[in-house]
Amino acid sequence: MITTYEEALDWIHNRLRFGIKPGLERMEWMLEQLDFPQQNINAIHVAGTNGKGSTVSYLRNMLEEAGYKVGTFTSPYIETFNERISVNGQPISNEAMTALVQEVKPVVERLEHTNLGSATEFEVITIMAFLYFGYHDSVDYVVFETGLGGRYDSTNVVNPMVSIITNIGFDHMAILGDTVEEIAAEKAGIIKKEVPIITGAEQVKALDVITEEANLKQASLFVLGKEFKIENYEPLANGEGFTLKTPYGIFEHLQLNMLGYHQVKNAALAVMAVCYLKEKKKLSISNEQMIKGIQHTKWNGRFEIVNEHPLTIIDGAHNAEGIDSLLSTLRLHYEDRNIHLIFSCLNDKSADRMVQELETIAASITFTSFDFPRARAAGELYEMSTHRNKHMDEEWKKAIAYVKEKATGEQDMVVITGSLYFISEVRAFLLK
């Protein structure tokens, strides 16, 4: 019998041993047992290699600005586990989390006696989110972020009002495939019959796959750069400025408080989705509320300044495309700085390419590791590097202390990156 929050979390985390098991049969079985809570939800579904979390955040802030109560389901968490299921940006309470576990545990145990096998950790958390938003907290809208891929992701049992595929890049190839087409096909698996799809995917081969799936499902397709366009882009001192042209109107002088051209693209996708829903009378929102919403958006761990002396930025880039976005943001806003990098990543990432890219901008690069089952050893990363000013320490707190001791000049800055799991630990430590 689970009675405390700690027991509830332990029970959830114990599901980790079941790994990642693509497929929706277990989800469908459990949802049927719980009387289909997902059917009570006005959902927006977000997939893609990078930018999902930021896109979810832009959507939430716009809808909140219009007075709506908005649920979000995201992963991984940055500060507390509960933030994976949030309402208006606030994680649900420990009591609510415990009650959800008490409710789903018997269903999960019954599932184990079927030929479908055991539910994974991610499946259990997804079921809890459906239950919470479907029956326990009457929110107006819920934005669901996929965990991995799309077609067989446990969130893909939802029937959304609109779907978004942020972009297509190389990540989780062991599960999603090695080519752009294979990865795009997995992401395009979220496209539902007659549900519009909005995408920032750029590769011709990826767009071909998405277009084919959209045609098959009779889903209207809106492609960034075609049906809606970013114009008049300009980097600002503390953000980005741009104009967005959509089929439903032009938004001039849009401003973001988040840095990087990739954030302009994420915001454009979110604005396009809200424009579509407004046009179809699925929600009521003014252009001013949309503009204000995206301007107010912040997303922890995404190019976030956590210290001023020395200037220290943490960024959750965890694959080659994420590192590319990080580097272009640094070149755009901090090109005259000496950048001291601290890097750690997971075993299943293309670390060699990430290290090579980072070396092009680094005054120094320090490799470290962190307490996580799939974290890569600092020594392995160090061996990949050919940088003339490289260093390693398996303990990340020591690595940070070492770099901060060195970064004392006016132009020195520290950038910590490589994994969302890593920067979530670092963030808590640096903001203490």
Annotated model-derived regions:
Residues 136, 141-146, 153-164, 168-172, ...:
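Nucleotide phosphate-binding/pyrophosphate-handling subdomain across enzymes
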Residues 419:
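Active-site-proximal loop/hinge segments that shape catalytic or ion-binding/gating pockets
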Residues 200-201, 215-235, 256-261, 289-296, ...:
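Beta-strand->loop->alpha-helix junctions that form or flank phosphate-binding loops
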Residues 59, 151-161, 427-431:
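Short Gly/Thr/Asp-enriched flexible loops that form oxyanion-binding sites at enzyme active sites
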Residues 150-151, 158-218:
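Conserved catalytic-core segment of NTP-binding enzymes
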Residues 203-212, 216-222, 311-314, 320, ...:
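C-terminal helical cap/extension that packs against the catalytic core
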Residues 31-32, 36-39, 65-158:
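ATP-dependent carboxylate-amine ligase catalytic core
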Residues 1-48, 55-68, 73-75, 109-117:
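Short functional linear segments
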